[in-house]
A protein has these predicted regions:
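Conserved Rossmann-fold cofactor-binding substructure of NAD(P)-dependent oxidoreductases
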Residues: 347-366
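Flexible, Lys/Arg-rich cytosolic regulatory linkers and terminal tails that connect or flank
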Residues: 225-287, 403
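Strand-loop microenvironment adjacent to phosphate/nucleotide-handling motifs in alpha/beta enzyme folds
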Residues: 7, 14, 271, 276-280, ...
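NAD(P)-cofactor binding segment of oxidoreductase domains
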Residues: 226-240, 310-317, 361-362, 382-409
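N-terminal Rossmann NAD(P)H-binding glycine-rich loop of SDR-like oxidoreductase domains
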Residues: 286-302
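Signature of alpha-helical transmembrane segments in polytopic membrane proteins
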Residues: 1-145, 173, 234, 241
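Conserved Rossmann-fold NAD(P)-dependent oxidoreductase catalytic core, especially the SDR/UDP-sugar
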Residues: 249-251, 370, 376-377, 382-433
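A solvent-exposed beta-alpha-beta segment
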Residues: 27, 133-240, 316-325, 330, ...
Length: 614
């Protein structure tokens, strides 16, 4: 049947074919009406009258052909027959009734009652043909589709999805029914039953051999949404969720996507003060170091929406920087970003002090976001000198250049690992915070650091590692069964960094609300289930032990740091601590001399840890 619909001949002559079918239905309707009026009794008088009626047959069929085409009944898709098609069909039959009645009164060929009955039958049979086609098409679709699916939500979203599944062959599913709250249990929606409540999802899936779950509920609290997601993913059945997005025509569109791990973290929505961010970014020259990294690249993507005059992307990774610029050039061609924004990609290492100064003098950025850093804990434990040279002295170069070259605003990306650090990476980040807070900002520069936890999907983070392990069918490795971490998505982190940049004044440290810490073991369990597998049966989760310098639990603030709210409920600020600049400079000189004298990793680490003690 599908090959017939897709054939060129059918597509070309479809309208004419449907019009001819409609005319045949009209003819049949008039014959039935005539037989009903004569009580299905045939005699000589009836035969004579039939011959007389045949004289007006051509006019009657031509009239219906023209009127039905004027109302475009042949244009509608029978599979989607609905209220609009019903109204158009009724109006065409009514217009034909009026015209036929006028001529009947003129020629007295047959009665008005016959015309009325015939047009009523026309309306019924025309709609009936369309409904029969729709039912037949649905039956054929059901036979072809062997995978059962379950829809969570017996509301508008569920209704729209069910119709989309039946009308779109891209969905190879047979809807067995719906799940919703208790008051809807036992009711029907478009011929499909509400099988039970959402809490019964596992039992219903097992009883009906469900292969896919669609979640269409949107108007619920975040807590309830989280409960629904947890219940559905616990079945280890592939689950898709309804998402609403705004298209190029500025209207709402619905799509269904696989549940992502970020859907299961119950992150609060972000309320950005767009006017505040725009006040320091719009028509400004903005520089981002580490622009090729996960956070740096997302910062760039967010910044372009505020129309800076120029965006300077700085990184040592040429491939990442090249790909990011290509992404923006494509956006320009598609008119998805302001064409007037100048883009500069600079291959510069933050460890090259003279190059950083040259960059600041030549481009004179108004705002600098410093995201360049080494971040992997085990690697930095093995190479502490590399971490110190890049994270501490590289950051020192950027801060000094910003202070000396009259930059208006400097925002540094920090980490929760800088709080009571037990590893080299965290210690280097804490030292950069101390160096920033020790600088003299009388020149008018607004400086701040933004401290947050792990971001989902960043390069080398736990999420892509787990995905790769699951893909390869091997064990998913967790360092400790009870280890916990804070998580947020990369776009969330970038948006909050931009918002915190507005609050930057005198060397504050901003802390982002990371929500509740997530147990990594539970995260691995959920990711395995999202892949349609069962932990412990299909894939094992293995505990391999803590890595050097790794904490069981991360913190976001030091005990001596006093926390204050900002006007954004996800951003908190810690009052700057009085840190002596000469003391910090002395510590850094001592650290540099030590690295020039020895490669002893333990000694260098001990000195670094001692320097950051408050």
């Amino acid at each position: 049947m599908n090959s017939l619909y897709k054939s060129n001949i059918y597509q070309k002559y479809r309208g004419i074919l449907i019009s001819l079918i409609d005319v045949c239905i009209v003819l049949f309707s008039y014959l039935v009406a005539y037989m009903i009026q004569n009580n299905f009794f045939i005699n000589e008088k009836t035969i004579a009258l039939t011959k007389l009626l045949a004289l007006g047959l051509f006019f009657m069929l031509l009239l219906h052909f023209i009127v039905l085409r004027l109302f475009k009944t042949q244009m509608s898709l029978w599979t989607y027959t609905g209220p609009n098609e019903i109204i158009r069909t009724f109006l065409s039959c009514f217009v034909c009734f009026l015209i036929m009645s006028y001529f009947v009164l003129k020629v007295h060929l047959f009665s008005i009652e016959l015309i009325a009955l015939a047009e009523l039958l026309c309306f019924i049979f025309l709609l009936g043909a369309r409904m029969l086609y729709r039912m037949a098409r649905r039956y054929i679709v059901d036979v072809d589709r062997v995978d059962n699916c379950l829809i969570v939500g017996a509301g508008n979203g569920g209704y729209l999805l069910m119709n989309e599944i039946y009308h779109n062959m891209a969905y190879p599913y047979n809807v067995i029914g719906f799940l919703d709250d208790f008051k809807k249990k036992g009711t029907m929606l478009s011929g499909k039953p509400v099988l039970g409540t959402i809490s019964e999802v596992e039992r219903i899936c097992q009883e009906n051999n469900v292969r896919c779950i669609f979640i269409t509920i949107s108007s619920v609290t975040e807590e309830r949404k989280q409960e629904i997601l947890d219940l559905c993913t616990s079945t280890s059945i592939p689950t898709k969720i309804m998402r609403i997005f705004v298209g190029n025509d500025e209207s709402n569109h619905i799509s269904f996507e696989d549940i992502d791990i970020k859907d299961l973290l119950n992150r609060p929505s972000i309320d950005l003060k767009v006017d505040q961010i725009g006040s320091y970014l719009t028509n400004k020259v903005v520089c981002v170091t580490g622009a090729g990294g996960s956070i740096g690249s997302e910062l760039c993507r967010q910044i372009i929406h505020f129309n800076p005059s120029k965006l300077i992307m700085v990184d040592i990774n040429e491939n990442a920087l090249y790909m990011l610029k290509q992404e923006f050039l494509v956006m320009k061609r598609k008119k998805q970003m302001n064409d007037s924004i100048q883009l500069e990609s600079l291959i510069v290492s933050i460890r090259e002090r003279e190059e950083i100064y040259k960059l600041m003098r030549n481009y004179k950025p108004d705002v600098v976001y410093h995201a360049a850093a080494h971040k992997h804990v085990p690697l930095m434990e093995d190479r502490p000198t590399e971490a110190i040279r890049n994270n501490i002295f590289g950051t020192k170069n950027v801060i000094d250049a910003c202070c000396d070259c009259g930059i208006s605003r400097f925002i540094m990306i920090s980490t929760d690992k800088a709080v009571n650090p037990t590893n080299v990476m965290g210690a280097t980040k804490r030292m950069t915070e101390m160096y920033m807070q020790s600088r003299n900002t009388k020149g008018g520069i607004h400086m701040a650091a933004v401290r947050f936890g792990n971001v989902l999907g960043s390069n080398g983070s736990v999420i892509p590692i787990f995905k790769e392990q699951i893909k390869n069918g091997g064990q998913v490795t967790v360092t400790h069964k009870d280890i916990k971490r804070y998580f947020m998505t990369i776009p969330e982190a970038a948006q909050l960094v931009l918002q915190a940049g507005f609050y930057a004044n005198e060397r504050e440290i901003f802390v982002l609300d990371m929500g509740k810490p997530v147990r990594i073991w539970d995260l691995a369990d959920k990711m395995i289930r999202l892949a349609g597998l069962v932990p412990g049966r299909d894939i094992e989760i293995q505990e391999i032990g803590l890595r050097p310098g790794e904490k069981m639990f991360e913190e976001l603030a030091l005990e001596m740091e006093e926390c204050h709210k900002t006007d954004n409920n996800l951003i908190f600020v810690h009052e700057k601590m009085d840190i002596d600049s000469k003391e910090v400079d002395s510590k850094l000189n001592k650290l540099k001399e030590l690295m020039d004298q020895t490669d002893d990793k333990l000694q260098i680490k001990e000195v670094l840890m001692d320097m950051i003690k408050e």
